[in-house]
């Protein structure tokens, strides 16, 4: 390898400086668990004192869920060329059921490792992979079913609770009752509850043993609704440095997991850079890379090529694989009369292979072989919906639901091997058909976590599909979907840039939070209540900081009221100083307090005073000035 830093390493270092700013008004804190090395990160939002006019009380800081890793902690020196610290390495080693290999097992991986032409784009540090010992199963589901609470399970329990016990103000704890549609929402998440949910298959904790840098998180309908962000280069756009930047950008704004969907050059090297710098689980669609290995000719794919790809990616540390094993030969003709046919890339690849060979999908016939690989590294299944509808006209048809039934069959098979599994879902579905999708998934797949792309609720808004899909995402999240895959404004139009990623994440953070509110997730409303209180008290900076995107909120406010003095003003540019509803309400309260009457009496008295004033001035609707 070259001794001097490569151009890519230099780019990575400059990126390090661009993505390490703390989120405005916040600081990173850590909540310790039962052991010294179990430190759960959260974002603490500092709040200012209520103005004397409104009571003058202190407003304690508020802790919120944080996905940004060390990138928003100014105390941590970030070097993307070195990667993140291996947070979970000791926990993995302590279990004694894995061993470090002396090299890569994948033939493709070994070939890349010894190709000097790739030195310029290779991740600098060499790391030896781990694998389960002979006969061992190292999945979190396997441990859970044996009654073991792992450090990872304790970690996510602390994380899910978000220090709600520190919120003592009853007005902030106020929350509307939810409608959970049969979900087992807990008032407090315990490590034992986490273990039970994973053991039952109702939740997954995606943590490959070769991704020790990841901060444990959980996906399940009885936990906070999560979101996924997609990144990845293509043959015509983006490079490694840009994808690493998009990773860090995604998690800064709230991406709980990230899928690398790269299909262009250097897929292997791009993925290594991403995983080594990711504090969140990374997912992939292995068939994309397998297709590259046969120069894009789907009919030339083989089980051996795909198997080698799975091992290659598992040894890099991919946490979950999208596997399109439910695209069966008999389902392909059912798509013939669809408006948009098969729109899933993975689904179309496997459909073409099935038709070319007139054989059953080799991902289906080799499914138990895949399970053997998954449980040797603790890679979770994300069973792909290769026949998802690509327009609302095709929603809930025989092809889509036939595949879903097969995914239910495969889920039960994966569970026999203690392999963690979630199910991917649509797609394009009008609002009135969304609940049918959720109900059928719960029924067919034994309550395994549902992971949906939207769904988009209308097809008429290219350029705004982050909105059309967030509508469906909020609904299906409320009905029980555990993780929502974001859609950006560029959906159907092009590869998203950094701003598109941010817009998509914001739309989906809103949808996920709205779903948590509707389900009645404990503490979900605390942040809403805190922001509403700040808004009523004209604490502008607190309003910005409590929002999902503090920078955007401040930017919009400052377009019209940029001065520091405006941060203390009792109005904004929407209504101005004389028509602010909240200022008027406060005036009514002040009048009531001064005159010793109720607010209702104050309003009545005020109306009488204004009536007398109107008559005294001549009772004319319009007066000459």
Swiss-Prot record:
Cysteines paired by S-S bonds: none
Pfam family, one: ThiC-associated
Protein's pathway: Cofactor biosynthesis; thiamine diphosphate biosynthesis
This protein's UniProt keywords: 4Fe-4S, Iron, Iron-sulfur, Lyase, Metal-binding, S-adenosyl-L-methionine, Thiamine biosynthesis, Zinc
Residues the record lists as binding Zn(2+): 428, 492
GO-annotated cellular components: cytosol
PANTHER family: PHOSPHOMETHYLPYRIMIDINE SYNTHASE, CHLOROPLASTIC, THIAMINE BIOSYNTHESIS PROTEIN THIC
Protein name per Swiss-Prot or TrEMBL: Phosphomethylpyrimidine synthase
The organism of origin for this protein: Xanthomonas axonopodis pv. citri (strain 306)
Highest classification ranks of the organism: Bacteria, Pseudomonadati, Pseudomonadota, Gammaproteobacteria, Lysobacterales
């Amino acid at each position: 390898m070259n001794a001097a830093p490569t151009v890519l390493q230099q780019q990575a270092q400059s990126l390090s400086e661009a993505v390490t700013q703390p989120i405005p008004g916040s600081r990173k804190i850590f909540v310790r668990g039962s052991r010294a090395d179990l430190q759960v990160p959260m974002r603490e939002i500092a709040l200012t004192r209520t103005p004397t006019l409104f009571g003058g009380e202190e407003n304690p800081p508020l802790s919120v869920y944080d996905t940004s890793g060390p990138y928003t902690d100014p105390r941590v020196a970030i070097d993307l060329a070195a990667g993140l610290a291996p947070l979970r390495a000791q926990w993995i080693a302590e279990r004694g059921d894995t061993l470090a290999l002396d090299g890569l097992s994948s033939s493709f991986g070994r070939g890349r490792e010894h190709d000097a032409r790739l030195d310029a784009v290779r991740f600098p540090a060499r790391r030896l992979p781990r694998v389960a010992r002979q006969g061992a199963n190292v999945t979190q589901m396997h441990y859970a079913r044996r009654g073991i609470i792992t450090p990872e399970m304790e970690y996510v329990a602390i994380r899910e609770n978000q220090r709600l016990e520190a919120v003592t103000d009853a007005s902030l704890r106020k929350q509307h009752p939810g409608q959970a549609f049969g979900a087992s929402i807990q008032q407090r998440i315990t490590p034992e509850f986490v273990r039970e949910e994973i053991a039952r298959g109702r939740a997954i904790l995606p943590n490959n043993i070769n991704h020790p840098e990841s901060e444990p998180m959980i996906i399940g309908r009885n936990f906070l609704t999560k979101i996924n962000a997609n990144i990845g280069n293509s043959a015509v756009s983006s490079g490694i440095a840009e994808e690493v930047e998009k990773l860090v950008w995604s998690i800064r704004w709230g991406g709980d997991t990230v899928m690398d969907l790269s299909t262009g050059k250097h897929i292997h090297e791009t993925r290594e850079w991403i995983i080594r710098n990711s504090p969140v689980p990374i997912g992939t669609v292995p068939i994309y890379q397998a297709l590259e290995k046969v120069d894009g000719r789907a009919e030339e794919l083989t089980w051996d090529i795909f198997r080698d790809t799975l091992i290659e990616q598992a040894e890099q540390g991919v946490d979950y694989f999208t596997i399109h094993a439910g695209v069966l030969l008999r389902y392909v003709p059912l798509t013939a009369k669809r408006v948009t046919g098969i729109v899933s890339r993975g689904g179309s690849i496997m459909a073409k292979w099935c038709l070319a060979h007139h054989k059953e999908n080799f991902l289906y016939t080799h499914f138990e072989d895949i399970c053997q690989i998954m449980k040797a590294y603790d890679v979770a299944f994300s069973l792909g919906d290769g026949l998802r509808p690509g327009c609302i006209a095709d929603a809930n048809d025989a092809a889509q639901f036939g595949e879903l039934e097969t995914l239910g069959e495969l889920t039960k098979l994966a569970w026999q091997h203690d392999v963690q599994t979630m199910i991917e879902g649509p797609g394009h579905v009008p609002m009135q058909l969304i609940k049918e999708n959720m109900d059928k998934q719960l029924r067919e797949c034994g309550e395994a976590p549902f992971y949906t792309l939207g769904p988009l609720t209308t097809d008429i808004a290219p350029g705004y599909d982050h909105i059309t899909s967030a509508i469906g995402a909020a609904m299906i999240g409320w009905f029980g979907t555990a993780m929502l895959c974001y859609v950006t404004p560029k959906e159907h139009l092009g590869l998203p840039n950094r701003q598109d990623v941010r817009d998509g994440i914001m739309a989906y953070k809103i949808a996920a939070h709205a779903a948590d509110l509707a389900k009645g997730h404990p503490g979900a409303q605390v942040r809403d209540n805190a922001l509403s209180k700040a808004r009523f008290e004209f604490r502008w900076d607190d309003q910005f900081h409590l929002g999902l995107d503090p920078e955007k909120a401040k930017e919009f406010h400052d377009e019209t009221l940029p001065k520091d003095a405006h941060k203390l003003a009792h109005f904004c540019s929407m209504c101005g100083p004389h028509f602010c509803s909240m200022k008027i309400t406060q005036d009514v309260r002040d009048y009531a307090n001064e005159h010793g009457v109720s607010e209702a009496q104050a309003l009545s008295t005020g109306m009488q005073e204004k009536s007398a004033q109107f008559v005294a001035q001549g009772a004319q609707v319009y007066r000459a000035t």
